[in-house]
Amino acid sequence: PDVKFIINGAGFGKIGETEALAMEEETGMVDVNCRALTAVTRLVLPYMSENSRILQFASAAAFLPQPRFAVYAATKSFVLSYSRALAMELKSRQIYVTAACPGPVKTEFFDIAETTGEIPLYKRLVMANPKKVVKKALRDSMMGKRVSVYGPLMKVFFLLVKVFPHDFILSLLFSA
């Protein structure tokens, strides 16, 4: 077989402090978001040829540690880092790797993630249309971009975490 495009979009998250979440939930996030993505990518790579594409769904959570979303954000940081490294490794074979890093998207994700049953207001305000997110990610992949960030607010967030120290941003976002 000749695989021209693979999309790794499986993943889940659980919101809550580490000690409040079940260990199985946390290790499950690592298994699905990191191990499964790596395994699928590794299994398909031998069947990919020149001008093939790999689109890995990370998250804007990959850009900054997230209290109460710690394991999820860490797994998505893994996806982003792995995708960037893989893009360099596969460059000589002309296989292009893109990490899609959307913010909150209107899917059933938060039905599973939000353990309190309430989606925070700021997340509801910036929720993106899933079709638009996918369309942008596919377009960015076809253009050979290594990172796809959807929407102006997430692009600003992406720039802020590059400019300001993470501890400063975290203190603003999560001050109690």
Regions found by a protein language model. Give the residues of each.
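Conserved NAD(P)H cofactor-binding loop of Rossmann-fold oxidoreductase domains
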Residues: 9-14
